[in-house]
């Protein structure tokens, strides 16, 4: 039996076909009830007799509508019929071999530690594969993957920052497809910017297939007024524009894909840069970015949020660099970009090394967050305070300045990153599933391995922990990417800085060995490391930096980590250089 669905207010069709086989002498009939197609099976059984039910489902989708609906639906049904000619064991064997080959190339292995750690990595990679529409660049990764209808399947900045890196270092063609999703939706982003009085592209906070803003207008109830509160993210959480540009540059530097950067990448960089240039306001002789929400999200409608301003600067800076490199003829843009970079005010690091989150954060009072941190992820702070009240205190939902330190590591010293971590983490409740992973990576870069592992482990328990209701609406898709990030960018110390691949490995004491695959500029690497040494096998000669020192690898090389010292200032030296 099959059903063809034409989605309302859309341009897509879905066909669902089902074949149910039942062993033995059975009677079957079919009915339709309340928009359901039902197959009824009855059988007379003796004690100990076994009946086997085999159900095969084929789901098809299209958005071109070139063929007549019935003809397309019949073609989809024929695909099911072809599969039904094979036995369950035959279909299982094909699937098993496909997964075997995939795991052989992609699996990350950990020796030592608890069984949970390896299971968490396997769990993360499994979902990172199945929930990514690698076959369709007009779709992206839903906030709940394929496991539930939370957030209505919408796409957030989570994709570019938490999910794309896995694909970038595992299968760059998938990362390219995810970025082309944003490129296809440029018209909607340009229209949103225009409606708000700006130029360039303002991508929606919650995105779907059309590229239009999908964020609901209202959400939770204000505990003081009893009224529904407006969702402010779509109005002012504009950092996702720069996050997308950051992902474009990460892709470009990791792959060297000139065909992409000269076309789709250039368009994304220029349009996002134009947005920031028009978004800035002049205050005396400087440009500032006002009325924004940073990743924190508990601090709303502030001026000069550090994350937003630094990322906007990076966005325009990289757009200008690519424009010059690939011969952009838009002289007006180049002039405006140069002036923006010259005049934009960036929050300055204080003498104690802390970067203020925004213009007003440091003047707000701090409160004891112990009971709220103990219930991290539950947003219990909003049971005691309204959002307006939370906004007037030093309270973070998730990493903000620490997130900036993670995304642009080359721009901040290790001392400043440590100062920010020590200042902001006690003020962070970790009410977002994404917060602890980022704190863990920055902690690892600062040499705080015990704290880093604790953050990573707690991040794995968001959906794999004791709470049976953590994924009632679906798993936290981005948190699966965060598990990979914590292991590879945290403990293995993988990062891309100024176009170079860096490895600054430091395993937690719970792990004796970590082995993982890595793609870099056309080369397939296999990296295996422990506390003393690192082995790198490559499909072609490659250069990278190990603890800051440039090394070359051909075929397979083993390095003693004791020969590569990483001082606190982040500049590597060998023992010989020290002498």
Place the predicted regions along the sequence by residue:
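Acidic/polar, glycine-enriched structural segments that form the non-catalytic walls/loops
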Residues: 1-151, 385-389, 568-579
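The feature captures the catalytic groove of carbohydrate-active enzymes
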Residues: 61, 147-155, 205-263, 271-342, ...
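Gly/Pro-rich turn-and-neighbor structural signature
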Residues: 106-139, 309, 329-360
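Contiguous, well-ordered alpha-helical segments that form the cores/surfaces of helical PPI scaffolds
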Residues: 122-129, 149-153, 157-168, 234-250, ...
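Helix-terminus loop motifs that line ligand-binding clefts
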Residues: 132-147, 173-246, 252, 259-261, ...
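Active-site core of glycosidic bond-cleaving carbohydrate-active enzymes
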Residues: 155-185, 237, 246, 263, ...
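C-terminal capping/lid segments that line or modulate ligand- or cofactor-binding pockets
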Residues: 162, 207-210, 214, 298-326, ...
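C-terminal beta-sandwich/jelly-roll accessory domains of carbohydrate-active enzymes
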Residues: 537-578
């Amino acid at each position: 039996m099959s059903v063809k669905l034409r989605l309302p207010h859309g341009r897509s069709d879905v066909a669902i076909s089902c074949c149910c086989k039942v062993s033995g002498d059975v009677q079957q009939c079919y009915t339709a009830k309340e928009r359901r197609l039902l197959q009824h099976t009855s059988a007379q059984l003796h004690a100990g007799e076994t009946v086997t039910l085999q159900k095969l489902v084929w789901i098809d989708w299209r958005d071109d509508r070139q063929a007549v609906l019935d003809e397309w639906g019949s073609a989809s049904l024929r695909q099911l019929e072809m599969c039904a000619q094979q036995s369950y064991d035959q279909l299982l064997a094909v699937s098993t071999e496909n997964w075997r080959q995939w795991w052989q190339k992609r699996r990350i292995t950990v020796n030592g530690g608890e069984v949970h750690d390896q299971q968490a990595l396997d769990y993360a990679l499994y979902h990172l594969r199945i929930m990514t529409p690698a076959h369709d660049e007009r779709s992206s990764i839903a906030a709940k993957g394929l496991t539930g209808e939370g957030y209505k399947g919408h796409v957030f900045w989570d994709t570019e920052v938490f999910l794309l890196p896995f694909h970038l270092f595992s299968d760059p063609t998938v990362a390219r497809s995810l970025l082309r999703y944003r490129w296809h939706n440029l018209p909607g982003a340009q229209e949103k910017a225009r409606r708000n009085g700006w130029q360039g592209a303002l991508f929606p906070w919650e995105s779907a297939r059309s590229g239009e803003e999908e964020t609901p207008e209202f959400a939770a109830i204000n505990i003081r007024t009893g009224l529904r509160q407006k969702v402010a993210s779509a109005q002012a959480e504009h950092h996702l524009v720069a996050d997308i540009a950051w992902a474009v540059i990460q892709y470009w530097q990791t792959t060297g894909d000139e065909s992409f950067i000269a076309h789709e990448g250039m368009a994304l960089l220029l349009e996002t840069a134009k947005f920031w240039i028009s978004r800035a306001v002049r205050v005396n002789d400087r440009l500032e970015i006002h009325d924004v929400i940073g990743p924190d999200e508990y601090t709303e409608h502030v001026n000069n949020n550090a994350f937003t301003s630094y990322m906007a600067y990076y966005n325009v800076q990289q757009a200008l660099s690519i424009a010059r490199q690939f011969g952009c003829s838009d002289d007006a843009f180049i002039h405006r970009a140069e002036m923006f970079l010259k005049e934009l005010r960036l929050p300055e690091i204080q003498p104690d090394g802390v970067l203020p989150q925004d213009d007003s954060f440091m003047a707000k009072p701090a409160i004891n967050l112990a009971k709220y941190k103990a219930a991290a992820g539950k947003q219990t702070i909003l049971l005691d305070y309204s959002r307006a009240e939370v906004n007037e205190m030093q309270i973070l939902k998730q990493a903000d300045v620490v997130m900036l330190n993670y995304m642009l590591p080359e721009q901040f010293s290790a001392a400043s990153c440590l100062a920010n971590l020590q200042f902001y983490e006690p003020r962070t409740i970790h009410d977002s599933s994404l917060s602890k992973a980022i704190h863990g990576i920055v902690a690892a870069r600062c040499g705080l391995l015990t704290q880093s592992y604790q953050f990573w482990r707690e991040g794995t328990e968001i959906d794999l922990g004791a709470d049976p209701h953590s994924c009632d609406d679906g798993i936290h898709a981005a948190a699966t990417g965060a598990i990979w990030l914590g292991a590879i960018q945290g403990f293995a110390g993988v990062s891309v800085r100024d176009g170079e691949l860096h490895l600054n490995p430091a395993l937690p004491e719970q792990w004796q060995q970590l082995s993982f695959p890595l793609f870099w500029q056309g080369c397939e690497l296999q990296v295996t490391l422990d506390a003393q040494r690192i082995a790198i096998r490559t499909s072609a000669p490659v250069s990278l930096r190990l603890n800051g020192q440039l090394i070359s690898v051909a075929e397979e090389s083993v390095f003693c980590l004791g020969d590569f010292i990483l001082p606190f200032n982040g500049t590597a030296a060998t023992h010989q250089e020290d002498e």
